[in-house]
């Protein structure tokens, strides 16, 4: 985790509270882990095996409507990035990532975690109090960071790309549009008492979204600039939809809720 000073934390808290939803600075890393996909799965399994989640909560950690809204919003944002992306992959729902998100949300800890998973996964957090009309009220603040972000064009990367952010943070947005982060799983949890930067929030609505593969690698751009779908990985077989490298998913949303 990148630490932020008490002064900047207080300022950030003040700025974000004006929107009724608070987001937390997320981490960046200098290089991808050398471990393969099975290590990610092993880390997820270890977390779920050790998590103390009441059985009543295990039945459903996010509604079908909320899941669809989050997934569709991410793909909409990813397909409309500017400058356009040549290798932006279509994002699909991952049940294991969602279960992992619930295990962390159930702790009601306002911080990223667990730490051993963050080597493999990206994570965006959001919290608010009071009623809300749509789950996207907790998600859109991540995208709103785009107004403060300057994309690093190829000529800016010599060889490492600079991170040009002219606001409190931009890494929630960059994680949303990280081209290779093609899986997402989220959970929402109501915390009766949650400590948010020194203040106790009553009945805080806590959203955790996990992403894989992890994005926000230091020195790298979120995606490759170019004609949409012109640099898709070979595994996609040339399939493209709405400017996204499309995997030809055959299962529908209901599959995840059987």
Swiss-Prot record:
One of its GO terms (molecular function) is peptidase inhibitor activity. Glycans are attached at residues 26, 36, 124. PROSITE patterns: CRISP_2. It is found in: Secreted. Residues 71-211 form the SCP domain. Weakly expressed. Expressed at low level in prostate, mammary gland, salivary gland and thyroid gland. Transmembrane segments: none annotated. The keyword Glycoprotein applies. One of its GO terms (cellular component) is extracellular space. Residues 20-60 form a propeptide. The keyword Lyase does not apply. Residues 1-19 form the signal peptide. Keywords: Developmental protein, Glycoprotein, Protease inhibitor, Secreted, Signal. Its main location: secreted. N-glycosylated. InterPro entries: Allrgn_V5/Tpx1_CS, CAP_dom, CAP_sf, CRISP-related, PI15_CAP. It comes from the Eukaryota. Belongs to the CRISP family. Serine protease inhibitor which displays weak inhibitory activity against trypsin. May play a role in facial patterning during embryonic development. This is Peptidase inhibitor 15. It comes from Homo sapiens (Human).
């Amino acid at each position: 985790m990148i630490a932020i000073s008490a002064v900047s934390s207080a300022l950030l808290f003040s700025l974000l509270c004006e929107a009724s939803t608070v987001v937390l600075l997320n981490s960046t890393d200098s290089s991808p882990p050398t471990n393969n996909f099975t290590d990610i799965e092993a880390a997820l399994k270890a977390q779920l095996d050790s998590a103390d989640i009441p059985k009543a909560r295990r039945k459903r950690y996010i509604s079908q409507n909320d899941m669809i809204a989050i997934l569709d919003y991410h793909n909409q944002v990813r397909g409309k990035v500017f400058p356009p992306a040549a290798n932006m992959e279509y994002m699909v729902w991952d049940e294991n990532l969602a279960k992992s998100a619930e295990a962390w949300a159930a702790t009601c800890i306002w911080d990223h975690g667990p730490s051993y998973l963050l080597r493999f996964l990206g994570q965006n957090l959001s919290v608010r109090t009071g009623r809300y009309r749509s789950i996207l009220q907790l998600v859109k603040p991540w995208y709103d960071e785009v107004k403060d972000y300057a994309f690093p064009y190829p000529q800016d990367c010599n060889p490492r790309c600079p991170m040009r952010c002219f606001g409190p943070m931009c890494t929630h947005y960059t994680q949303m549009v990280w081209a290779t982060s093609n899986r997402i799983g989220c959970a929402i949890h109501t915390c009766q008492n949650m400590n948010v930067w020194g203040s106790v929030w009553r009945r805080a609505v806590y959203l955790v979204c996990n992403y894989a593969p992890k994005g926000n690698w230091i020195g790298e751009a979120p995606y490759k600039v170019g004609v949409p779908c012109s640099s898709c990985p070979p595994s996609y077989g040339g399939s493209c939809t709405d400017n996204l490298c499309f995997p030809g998913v055959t299962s529908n949303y209901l599959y995840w809720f059987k």
